[in-house]
UniProtKB/Swiss-Prot annotation:
Belongs to the purine/pyrimidine phosphoribosyltransferase family. GfcR subfamily. Contains an N-terminal DNA-binding winged helix-turn-helix domain and a C-terminal regulatory domain (or effector binding domain) resembling phosphoribosyltransferase (PRT) domain. It comes from the Archaea. This is Transcriptional regulator GfcR. InterPro entries: GfcR-like, PRibTrfase_dom, PRTase-like. Pfam families: Pribosyltran.
């Protein structure tokens, strides 16, 4: 995306295709608050937008070759933390949607199993209150030591949710690994965070 107008247009298109604001925020790598603003206030500019940064990592994501190299670098960083803290890993948990391709390559590099977590923001239900869950098509996390992999930390809520979900199922989260951290944080819910890039606002 090159401008705020591009973001408004893309957010509006995705909304018209039936995506929820949480799903749109995942696609555009901005917070849900920013999506709400883009869809309701941006064109009128009556309310200032939230402070956020749009991240477009599609040049990496559209190439399995590039993504594999990024996953290798992230894997090395994960091993550094695990070694330093004398921790182990059984399962890499990818956060859907955009964290899954990266997580599958990290799991392959590490030689461990793969699980997929669907966060609440990916659920759309009018009948019941949505909540995140693990796909049953992948590894079981019960009693296992895990690393969570996602693409971007925007607010940290999705990863807090994932850690709590895994904890409720008897899993232990030892590391959270992301491509880009827009919060500049060292840990989430007491779990160390490693990122290839930290983006920190200075204003």
């Amino acid at each position: 995306m090159k401008s705020i107008e591009d973001l408004i247009k893309k957010a509006t298109e995705l909304k018209s295709e039936g995506l929820s604001e949480g799903q749109i925020s995942e696609e555009l790598n901005v917070s849900r608050e920013t999506i709400t603003w883009l869809l309701t206030h941006a064109e009128r500019a009556t309310v200032p937008g939230p402070k956020d940064i749009s991240v477009d990592w599609s040049m990496i994501g559209r190439s399995a070759y590039r993504l594999s190299h990024i996953a290798q670098a992230l894997t090395e960083m994960i091993f550094d933390i695990l070694d330093e803290k004398e921790l182990d890993i059984d399962i890499v948990v990818g956060v859907a949607l955009s964290g899954v391709p990266l997580a599958s390559m990290v799991a392959d590099h590490m030689g461990v199993g793969l699980a997929v977590y669907m966060p609440t923001k990916q659920m759309a239900s009018q009948d019941v209150k949505p909540h995140g869950n693990l796909s049953t098509n992948f590894s079981d996390v019960s009693g296992r030591e895990c690393v969570i992999v996602d693409d971007v930390i925007t607010s940290g809520r999705t990863l807090e949710e994932a850690v709590a979900y895994l904890d409720d199922r008897g899993a232990k989260t030892n590391v959270i690994a992301v491509l880009i951290d827009k919060k500049g944080i060292d840990s989430i819910a007491g779990v160390p965070v490693c990122s290839l890039l930290k983006v920190i606002r200075v204003n």
